[in-house]
Swiss-Prot record:
Residues 880-889 have a biased composition (Polar residues). It comes from Homo sapiens. This is Solute carrier family 38 member 10. GO terms for biological process: amino acid transmembrane transport; bone development. The lineage of its organism: Eukaryota, Metazoa, Chordata, Craniata, Vertebrata. It holds the Pfam family Aa_trans. Keywords: Amino-acid transport, Membrane, Phosphoprotein, Transmembrane, Transmembrane helix, Transport.
Length: 1119
């Protein structure tokens, strides 16, 4: 008996292997459909029915002496029964083989495609199935003694099934089997799934085709032995199925799909499991082909099977044997290629052929031969019920089965996964809005809308809380947007709110607010939650060519420009918070986006997109704000947007309309912005958006702006905190990007200044700006300067470039990026600068107070007079400076670094004093404008723009910087306090003004270069100054000098005293603080500065003065 039992284990193994197949993959799904309890009971019931049906066949065979299924059917029901059994057997075997191929294609295609580097697809799947059929299935199927050859493979296949079961168990443990969470998520009884699962369960136990061959292969055939063999086999299979179904269902609960293997993540274990399962299925093919081929042979050649006594392994002519084998193997392969769903083929086959072969036919045969068999009645009726009900159910579900399995299981999984991802994303956005912003900026110009909305909500939440103050800040922010158009006019009121809060201050522009009614003023995005500094960064106008290039990035770029239109069009308002953190931690946030592009690409595309939108909207909406708006229009014209920008610049009402949705308005403005966003990418669409904005109630917009301004103040503090977190998070990213950008910009600088390395963000822009300048035909700057009312308006290209360059450093932590240092250094420098600037702010205030005292400072010199007078005076007072500006720019680089640091701080103070808080809020734009002006002045005063090659020039700059930069610093310091990025921007400005920080000098120099080129003589000086003035070293000096800025500012303030009284310190291209100041003193200061600069630079300063005039128009209007 022991030997017999041992020999029986080989048969048991074969039977188990023939039973276990692709159906095991559907067990968890069936448990989900029926519930754990009902599913287990159905499995046990189907196992019992299968055992009974097998015993029916064994007993019938022992009584009738027939050894084939078809022979028993012929013996019981004649030819009809034989035909029914043969066709059912053929259909069952073919369906099973098709299911095998489908599983092989599903499990093998992914693995082998990745293994060999192919793309998973229908072609590769077809190739895989063909290879498996030709190399594995066919050789095994062509063997005549299949039982002996397959046993070894059966044992190997069972090993994979065992491993599969343990993997399922471990998966359930991993998914919290003992935590008990699944108890609430699983179902225990679902009667509606019974008729969907019984066919699959019946198919999963289908082994009737192996009963008689196994019985015939026994040395001593007996019913008892067969009963024990099949009982053992079915018990093993039932246990296996219950374990797989239970643990698989617990692991994936309602997300369970038909093929549970597809749930597992891709790793070595699961991949080996899939391959092993695929191989076991391939090896199991011969077990299915054997009865199928025999049934086909008896069906086609029944004359040889007349008596039905031939055993299943009976002799078959070689030709027929091979033909039938090939037809079955490749026929089922075609079916496997055409039918991609395992559940569909198993359900249909099990409900029809499976029920006939497994239950109905054995019960009918046994009932015919054994007259009294109650069990046969039960099995028969169950089989008939399965045949009828389950077939109808399966057919009705057949179309849905793939969808249900895919949707309910994979879809459920995907839905849950997506839900979890959304929840996590929401958490991340709430916890780390900056991180979300960085991701948004990178991933999408399109997605920014949703992300912006999320972050806007975060920022707007506080913005909405202060509804009163936001009204002021929002219009001011809109004004900042206008400077961003290309007008370098600093926003005075942007700083007035709270210098430490860069966003609010940047947003606020009293001068622009005064110029344009708050209603007309585009509600600043800063009020909407954007950092004013970010707006300034976004504001820098770019040439049309650059804008077009960057328009695809406008989704991201438009966000930063801080234009209501850009935000509306791009739906970027939600990004305002992101931008706010960028302003505070601009190097972190913007570098992520900017770093996307080479150097300033990110910046340029955004400023350009913003410029196109902002110049259209700001020129349209900011025409009043910077009645230098027409000059920006002209500048825009230079950039390629002259018509729209200039036209809009002349239209003050439009800005009010467009900006209205921009100032971080409630969701309604956002919707309007979204509407405008559709056409916002184009100037015409922007105009339409402006019209839409007009439709918004100005009262509502003003109220919202006020609220947003108040909220922005609060948000500024919050944003600074967020910026710190964001900066930390993005330090590495920004550092890497900054390094890349530095490398690229440095290359640009190498072209620009062979001896000076230019900041990353500015290097590329300067190269572009210079190219644009070179390409641009020389244009008389005087008319342009006086375009906005007799005052010279800097060309937008210059402003844009200066803004871009300044924006690049701002986004990149201007001081830090040139060195490629991590943002943390710029941030630390910014913090230091902020502290220094805080000290310098009062100093700047004092200097500003002193400045108005000067007769020249108080009166605002006429554009023409200033154009000639300051330059002439500068030339007279510093006859060598104009030359030094051109020739001594490189010399200035050395002191310029120090001067850049000190000048930056001084300029920032001067800007603060001159521009007031608006300078800070408008710093990004103001800075670019000032930088462009200063750079233009520096270009005009070739030595002054780049750096104090000659210290007297530096001194000249320093007094002016002290006056202007003191005013700017007053605002800038507050703004720096508010925005580290803005501080750096102003630092860059200071660098541009004094040493012309290589970042700023580049942008300013590009602008200056363009203007000088337009001006025959100044161009040379500017070009000289530009190549010589640019130095990456300024970045570190700026950072280091930030500490020195206080002392330098003090010293320069002393120097400024005489300059302010007598002559404004000649602007060696350093004057950055010519921001439109709400105070008359600022205008006087600007006039005096312009006069001095013009005196020093002579004709060259006229171009710069035009820039100054553009910036200045705001203050005169304010005055």
């Amino acid at each position: 008996m022991t030997a017999a039992a041992a020999s029986n284990w080989g048969l048991i193994t074969n039977i188990v292997n023939s039973i276990v197949g692709v159906s095991v993959l559907t067990m968890p799904f069936c448990f989900k459909q029926c519930g754990i309890v009902l599913g287990a009971l159905l499995l046990v019931f189907c196992s019992w029915m299968t055992h009974q049906s097998c015993m029916f066949l064994v007993k019938s065979a022992s009584l009738s002496k027939r050894r084939t299924y078809a022979g028993l059917a012929f013996h019981a029901y004649g030819k009809a029964g034989k035909m029914l059994v043969e066709t059912s057997m053929i259909g069952l075997m073919l369906g099973t083989c098709i299911a095998f191929y489908v599983v092989i294609g599903d499990l093998g295609s992914n693995f082998f495609a990745r293994l060999f580097g192919f793309q998973v697809g229908g072609t590769f799947r077809m190739f895989l199935l063909f290879a498996v059929s030709l190399c594995i299935v066919l050789p095994l199927s062509l063997q005549r003694n299949m039982m002996a050859s397959i046993q070894s493979f059966s044992a190997m296949a069972l090993l994979f099934y065992t491993v599969f079961m343990f993997v399922i168990v471990l998966s359930s443990l991993k998914h919290g089997l003992f935590s008990g969470q699944w108890l609430r998520r699983v179902s225990y009884v679902r009667w509606e799934g019974v008729f969907r699962c019984i066919p699959i369960f019946g198919m999963s136990f289908a082994c009737q085709s192996q009963v008689l061959p196994t019985y015939d292969s026994l040395d001593e055939p007996s019913v008892k032995t067969m009963s024990s063999i099949f009982a053992s086999s079915l018990n093993v299979v039932t246990t296996f199925y219950v374990m797989v179904g239970f643990f698989g269902y617990v692991s994936f609960t309602e997300a369970t799909a038909g093929n549970v293997l597809m749930h597992f993540p891709s790793n070595l274990v699961t991949e080996m499991l899939r391959v092993g399962f695929m191989m076991s299925v391939a090896v199991g093919f011969p077990m299915m082909i054997l009865p199928c081929r025999q049934a086909l042979s008896t069906l086609l050649c029944e004359q040889q099977q007349k008596d039905g006594t031939f055993a299943a392994g009976g002799y078959m002519p070689p030709l027929r044997f091979k033909a039938l084998t090939l037809s079955v193997v490749f026929g089922t392969m075609v079916g496997g290629i055409l039918i991609p769903n395992v559940e569909t083929i198993l359900g249909l086959t099990g409900a029809t052929m499976g029920s006939l072969i497994c239950f109905i036919c054995p019960a009918l045969i046994y009932k015919k031969i054994h007259k009294n068999a109650l069990s046969s009645q039960v099995v028969l009726w169950v089989g008939l019920g399965v045949l009828v009900v389950s077939t109808v159910t399966t057919l009705s579900v057949s179309e849905e089965v793939p969808e249900d399995l895919a949707e309910e299981a994979p879809g459920g999984r995907l839905g849950e996964a997506e839900g979890l991802m959304k929840v996590e994303a929401a958490r991340l956005s709430a916890q780390d809005p900056v991180v979300a912003v960085a991701e948004d900026g990178r991933e999408k110009p399109k997605l920014p809308k949703e992300r912006e909305e999320l972050e806007q909500a975060q920022i707007k939440g506080p913005v909405d809380v202060p509804g009163r103050e936001d009204g002021k800040e929002a219009p001011e922010e809109a004004q900042l947007d206008r400077p961003g158009q290309g007008i370098a006019v600093p926003v005075g009121e942007a700083h007035r709110h709270e210098p430490p809060v860069p966003h609010d201050k940047v947003v606020v522009d009293e001068g622009q607010d005064r110029e344009v009614p708050e209603e007309n003023k585009p509600p600043s995005r800063h009020a909407g939650g954007k950092a004013p500094g970010v707006q300034g960064q976004m504001a820098p106008p770019l040439p049309d060519s650059e804008r077009e290039k960057q328009e695809p990035e406008q989704g991201e770029v438009g966000k930063r420009p801080g234009q209501a239109q850009a935000l509306e069009e791009a739906g970027d308002l939600p990004e305002d918070p992101q931008k706010v953190p960028e302003a505070d931690g601009q190097p972190a946030v913007q570098p992520a986006k900017e770093d996307l592009g080479p150097g300033d690409r990110g910046l340029h595309p955004r400023p350009q997109a913003v410029l196109s939108e902002q110049q259209n909207g700001l020129a349209v909406g900011g025409g009043e704000k910077a009645k230098g708006g027409p000059p920006p229009g002209n500048a825009a014209g230079d950039t390629g947007q002259p018509a729209e920008d200039s036209d809009h610049g002349g239209k003050p009402p439009l800005p009010a309309e467009k900006p209205a949705p921009g100032p971080g308005l409630p969701p309604e403005p956002r919707e309007q912005r979204d509407v405008e966003r559709a056409g916002g990418n184009q100037a015409a669409s922007q105009l339409e958006e402006a019209g839409r904005a007009e439709m918004l109630d100005h009262a509502v917009l003003l109220q919202v702006i006020k609220e947003q301004q108040v909220q922005q103040k609060r948000l500024l503090d919050q944003q600074e905190k967020l910026l710190a977190v964001i900066e930390e998070q993005h330090k590495e990213i920004h550092q890497q990007r900054q390094e890349d950008e530095e490398d690229k910009p440095r290359q640009v600088e190498v072209h620009q200044e062979p001896g000076a390395a230019v900041p990353r963000g500015q290097e590329a822009p300067e190269g572009k700006a210079r190219e644009t300048v070179e390409n641009l035909p020389p244009l008389p700057l005087d008319p342009v300067l006086r375009a906005p009312g007799g005052r010279p308006a800097p060309s937008q290209d210059l402003n844009q470039r200066s803004l871009e360059h300044s924006e690049g450093p701002v986004g990149r932590d201007p001081a830090g990026p040139p060195d490629g240092g991590p943002d943390t250094e710029p941030r630390a420098a910014q913090a230091k600068l902020r502290d220094g600037q805080k000290d310098a702010a009062p100093r700047a205030a004092g200097t500003v107070k002193e400045l108005p005292k000067g007769p020249e400072q108080v009166p605002v010199p006429d554009p023409a007079r200033e154009a000639g007078g300051p330059e002439e005076r500068l030339a007279e007072e510093f006859p060598g400076q104009s030359q030094d500006v051109t020739g001594g720019s490189q010399d200035r680089k050395k002191p310029g670094k120090e001067v850049a640091a000190t000048g930056t701080s001084i300029l920032k103070e001067a800007n603060w004093l001159v521009a007031g808080p608006g300078a800070e809020t408008g710093d990004p734009r103001m800075k670019p404008k000032q930088v462009s002006r200063d750079l233009g002045l520096a270009a005009d005063l070739p030595g002054g723009a780049e750096g104090a090659a000659a210290q007297p020039q530096a001194v000249l700059r320093q007094p002016e910087l002290r006056v202007i930069s003191d005013g700017e610093q007053g605002g800038q310091q507050g703004h720096r306090l508010d925005h580290g990025g803005h501080l750096e921007m102003r630092k860059a400005r200071g660098g541009d003004h004094v040493p012309v920080s290589h970042e700023q000098p580049r942008g300013g120099e590009d602008a200056a270069v363009q203007e000088p080129r337009q001006r025959p003589e100044p161009e040379l000086g500017l070009k000289r100054a530009v190549p010589g003035g640019q130095r990456p070293d300024n970045a570190k000096p700026n950072r280091d000098l930030k500490l020195q800025a206080g002392s330098d500012l003090r010293r320069r303030r002393r120097d400024l005293g005489p300059h302010a009284e007598g002559q404004l310190a000649p602007r060696d291209g350093v004057i950055i603080g010519l921001n439109p100041l709400p105070d008359v003193q600022v205008n006087d200061l600007r006039g005096a500065l312009d006069a001095q600069l013009r005196q020093a630079a002579g004709g060259a300063l006229q171009v710069v003065h035009s820039r100054q005039l553009r910036q200045a128009p705001g203050p005169p209007e304010e005055s």
